[in-house]
From Swiss-Prot:
Name of the featured protein: tRNA-splicing endonuclease subunit Sen15
Gene name of this polypeptide: TSEN15
Protein family membership: Belongs to the SEN15 family.
Region of interest: Disordered: 1-35
Span of the signal peptide: none
């Protein structure tokens, strides 16, 4: 793979730096990944995320990495990408277990900063995406490190008791 030295923006993304991604990793050091040089750039889901025209290349890149992790490693079902233009976010909506309700996953690079107000806005938007107003407001934050490690945190509005089936007895 050849590293590109130009900084022309990719359609649908703003502010790309050398390597196709800006501001991801340690101190602005971008991965040497350029969509036109990699198989990712031709993947239908990546192209669908680019067409949303939300955020920059970093956001599309981390959303695509989380999509691949959910589909390939975690075996989620029917994961779709949804753009939230008012929040400038790409969200993933799918089901962890077939037949269960939709869950919202919000991919974010580790360098991003989230305020309480921003989290509240995302909670409200995720309720609309889940389609059931009776469910408690929640979403899963997928934090992507520069080495592609992904950590998932479930955020809810208030405290949630764990499922009894997920609690192991300790003596």
């Amino acid at each position: 793979m050849e590293e590109r030295g130009d900084s022309e923006p990719t359609p649908g993304c703003s502010g790309l730096g050398p390597g196709g991604v800006r501001g991801f990793g340690d101190g602005g050091g971008a991965p040497s990944w350029a969509p036109e040089d990699a198989w990712m750039g031709t993947h239908p889901k990546y192209l669908e995320m680019m067409e949303l025209d939300i955020g920059d290349a970093t956001q599309v890149y981390v959303a695509f990495l989380v999509y691949l992790d959910l589909m390939e490693s975690k075996s989620w079902h029917e994961v779709n990408c949804v753009g939230l233009p008012e929040l400038q976010l790409i969200c993933l909506v799918g089901t962890e277990i077939e037949g269960e309700g939709l869950q919202t996953v919000v991919p974010t690079p580790i360098t991003a900063s989230l305020s309480h107000n921003r989290i509240r806005e995302i909670l409200k938007a995720s309720r609309k995406l889940q389609g059931d107003p009776d469910l408690p407001m929640s979403f899963t934050l997928a934090i992507v490190e520069s080495d592609s490690t992904i950590v998932y945190y479930k955020l809810t509005d208030g405290f949630m008791l764990p499922d009894p089936q997920n609690i192991s007895l300790r003596r």
